[in-house]
């Protein structure tokens, strides 16, 4: 059937129907004369889209739902939380969400439900785009950026649920993370073939062991891992042993501490020839290269790294019996390491560095303050003498990020709020 018939049946505008096709929500066949020919299946899909959009569920989340990267419960649950934050549990839209799954299961007719696609939703980037992807501890996030207008076109956030349940340590499935990250990029590429570059960042400190073919031969042992603090045969922990032997302090969860513990306890995979971060491994996988390339910002997060010289402390590693060949190649510039679908991919950078780079307009004239559970302030500067609690971190192109972190942050605000809410100061 032709689009005018579809408009009458669904109550959607032509612009909205074309938008859903452009965004990859429906795939419309063509008649012999080249005109779009909508099927009954297309009508059913459009009716589902209208129900979901009426509930306020984003086009992004609908795409993730149709791609089976999110479940219906996921998208409805997310939307209910958004509505609860915006207008509370008693709103009409919240009540609509409560019955949405049943409406879809029943194949409910939607022509009686008033809905008009927002006009600004019908506009999206047509020029050159950049894609950034972030492999977080619990989610994979991606952003599509219009390079000419410097505007955000779309943002994706997908839980990866990758923790290995039968592990006594903090380990995550590499295959689950990489599969979801690649599917996210494929979904974006399908809608936006005009991507000019891809940038990658993610959770720091953790490591993935690799074999000679550049394949993962272990889970991701992430930054939360506590094996570095476990007592060993001499009753010292791996972190204490590193301090005693090298004089350098390193925290559990850092890649070198993890690898050192594994060496001492026979836990390094037999076919492992090296290790890298999870975002380095994603870049390797996309570019089909066999050796990891690690930016200084990530290498520093492994520990025993000389920030000023931009290299690992090889003498300290030798004292620990760590083979330097296990370490990834380190670069200080944000160079292109390969291509995916002819799109250049830059070496991955640390999440702190990426958040600074993406948040400020001028690197040299800005400071970034992040307040989460704790708090952090970052600014670009030169190597010098710093006080306690302040550290230099590698930035991009040989520059340094000066960072100060504190436990006091959002948790302190929450404590103050709780204190006053438990008092009767406002109700004498």
Question: Where are the regions that the model predicts?
Answer:
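Carbohydrate-associated surface elements
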Residues: 225
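Short, charged amphipathic alpha-helical surface segments
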Residues: 50, 64-119
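Basic helix-turn-helix/winged-helix DNA-binding cores
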Residues: 1-64
């Amino acid at each position: 059937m032709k689009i005018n018939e579809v408009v009458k049946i669904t109550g959607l505008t032509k612009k909205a129907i074309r938008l859903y096709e452009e965004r990859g929500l429906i795939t419309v066949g063509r008649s012999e004369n080249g005109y779009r020919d909508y099927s009954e299946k297309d009508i059913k899909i459009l009716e589902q889209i209208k129900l979901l959009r009426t509930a306020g569920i984003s086009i992004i989340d609908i795409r993730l739902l149709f791609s089976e990267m999110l479940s219906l419960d996921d998208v409805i649950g997310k939307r209910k939380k958004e509505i609860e934050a915006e207008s509370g549990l008693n709103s009409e839209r919240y009540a609509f969400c409560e019955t949405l799954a049943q409406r879809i299961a029943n194949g409910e007719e939607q022509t009686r439900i008033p809905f008009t696609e927002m006009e600004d939703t019908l506009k999206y980037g047509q020029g050159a785009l950049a894609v950034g992807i972030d492999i977080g501890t619990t989610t994979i996030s991606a952003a599509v950026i219009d390079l000419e207008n410097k505007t955000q076109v779309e943002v994706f956030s997908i839980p990866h649920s990758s923790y290995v349940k039968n592990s006594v340590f903090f380990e995550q499935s590499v295959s689950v993370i990489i599969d979801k990250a690649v599917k996210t990029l494929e979904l974006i590429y399908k809608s936006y073939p005009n991507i000019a570059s891809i940038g990658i960042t993610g959770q720091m400190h953790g490591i993935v062991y690799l074999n000679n073919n550049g394949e993962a031969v272990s889970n991701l042992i992430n930054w939360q891992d506590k094996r570095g603090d476990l007592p060993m045969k001499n009753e010292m922990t791996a972190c204490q042993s590193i301090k005693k032997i090298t004089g350098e302090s390193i925290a559990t969860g850092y890649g070198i501490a993890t690898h050192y513990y594994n060496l001492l306890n026979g836990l390094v995979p037999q076919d492992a020839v090296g290790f890298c971060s999870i975002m380095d491994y994603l870049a390797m996988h996309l570019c089909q290269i066999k050796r990891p390339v690690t930016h200084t910002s990530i290498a520093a997060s492994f520990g025993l790294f000389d920030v000023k010289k931009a290299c690992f402390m090889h003498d300290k590693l030798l004292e620990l019996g760590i083979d330097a060949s296990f370490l990834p190649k380190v670069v200080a510039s944000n160079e292109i390491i390969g291509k995916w679908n002819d799109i250049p991919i830059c070496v991955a950078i640390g999440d702190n560095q990426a958040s600074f780079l993406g948040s400020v307009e001028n690197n040299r004239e800005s400071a970034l303050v992040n307040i989460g559970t704790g708090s952090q302030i970052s600014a670009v500067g030169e190597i010098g003498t710093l006080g306690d609690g302040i550290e230099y971190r590698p930035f991009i192109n040989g520059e340094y990020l000066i960072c100060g972190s504190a436990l006091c942050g959002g948790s302190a605000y929450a404590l103050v709020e709780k204190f006053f809410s438990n008092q009767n100061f406002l109700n004498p």
